[in-house]
Amino acid sequence: MKIEEVKSTTKTQRIATHSHVKGLGLDENGIAKQAAAGLVGQENAREACGVIVELIKSKKMAGRAVLLAGPPGTGKTALALAIAQELGNKVPFCPMVGSEVYSTEIKKTEVLMENFRRAIGLRIRETKEVYEGEVTELTPCETENPMGGYGKTISHVIIGLKTAKGTKQLKLDPSIYESLQKERVEVGDVIYIEANSGAVKRQGRSDTYATEFDLEAEEYVPLPKGDVHQKKEVIQDVTLHDLDVANARPQGGQDILSMMGQLMKPKKTEITDKLRGQINKVVNKYIDQGIAELVPGVLFIDEVHMLDIECFTYLHRALESSLAPIVIFATNRGNCIIRGTEDVASPHGIPLDLLDRVMIIRTMLYTPQEMKQIIKIRAQTEGINISEEALNHLGEIGTKTTLRYSVQLLTPANLLAKINGKDSIEKEHVEEINELFYDAKSSAKILAEQQEKFMK
């Protein structure tokens, strides 16, 4: 007798840099806890982000911009991801990097506009009228063919539907009769018919017929419990970019040209302003009718100093348009030259007139104690045991070098501990690994000392 164990098919999730961030870690009054939801320290910045989240949720923040500014490794990207976690999956969050806008196929401004539209959601509410029940009768009514001849045409179909609450007799259009034939509906089947579109769906055979012996294996379903005529509300979430793409490249077409077009490599197409204008008109009409509501989301642009002066000028116009999301910039630059200009220096590499429109949130350097806490959280996330001594030593390394470097030493040190037959990382493992690798500062120091030996 052979017994096999079934292995789980779930994919093992790779631990990314910010896997441990679960939210902003604020209490009910919006005050930041010292360490919560994977974030440590940065209380002022987290509280400011909490205010931004509240403004976004109350839809009072659209078209504004926020800048997260601070030295490298102080948690700017982590804060942006925490904002995304706080907002939940119903609010669109579109992350991008400043260098993404440079493409050989489409304009820089087009890439920006695409991401702007990705960050604006549309929640469409649709009420569907549905007739559901077990078919008790199915009678097509025929009339003489108006075109002459001996054939007859179906004028309408009488169908009886039964549920646990009652029965109804419906008179249906002849076009629905074709759908009934396609679905092979017979008396005793449970079906539902959509009133708006006329779509028919056969759910299965009623379970009162389950005792019948049939050659074909049927799926038996219980008798529907509610009324025959029901109204269901369906909510769909789409982004404006989804609507743009759907209308820019309509699928289908049976002629040879469209067939060839589908076979060829799809080139990235630019969506024209005219098309976007028409989509905006339709969206505004839906909003006025109350069918849809606009959900302004978040566009997160990391390394914003990589954008050039043309992109910044375009951002001015985009931020002031009626359909604009909340834009969060992040940069680690101090005073530097704006890309695309010869000698115009500006704080954070952003033009002063755009800086004037943004609310700036500063992130501060971590204290040694906070660094230790972050390293401890990372070790727990990666499932690594670490002794107190090793943790203190890693905290010291982080203070001298950078937080990223000390976090990166965790996995190699864990590997070394396992080779030595230890369950947890000890101080000597960290010291040994630290001697093998260089951080950025010590590497630059060696480079300065041995400059003449390197190629110019």
From Swiss-Prot:
ATP binds at G70, P71, P72, G73, T74, G75, K76, T77. Pfam families: TIP49, TIP49_C. It catalyses: ATP + H2O = ADP + phosphate + H(+). InterPro entries: AAA+_ATPase, P-loop_NTPase, RuvB-like, RuvB-like_C, RuvBL1/2_DNA/RNA_bd_dom, TIP49_P-loop. Its EC number is 3.6.4.12. Its main location: nucleus. Keywords: ATP-binding, Cytoplasm, DNA damage, DNA recombination, DNA repair, Helicase, Hydrolase, Nucleotide-binding, Nucleus, Transcription, Transcription regulation. One of its GO terms (biological process) is regulation of transcription by RNA polymerase II. GO terms for cellular component: dynein axonemal particle; Ino80 complex; MLL1 complex; NuA4 histone acetyltransferase complex; R2TP complex; Swr1 complex. One of its GO terms (molecular function) is ATP binding. It is found in: Nucleus; Dynein axonemal particle. The keyword Cytoplasm applies. Disulfide bonds: none annotated. The keyword ATP-binding applies. Belongs to the RuvB family. Forms homohexameric rings. Can form a dodecamer with ruvbl2 made of two stacked hexameric rings. Is a component of the RNA polymerase II holoenzyme complex. Component of the chromatin-remodeling Ino80 complex. Component of some MLL1/MLL complex. PANTHER family: RUVB-RELATED REPTIN AND PONTIN (PTHR11093). Has single-stranded DNA-stimulated ATPase and ATP-dependent DNA helicase (3' to 5') activity suggesting a role in nuclear processes such as recombination and transcription. Proposed core component of the chromatin remodeling INO80 complex which exhibits DNA- and nucleosome-activated ATPase activity and catalyzes ATP-dependent nucleosome sliding. This is RuvB-like 1. It comes from Xenopus laevis (African clawed frog).
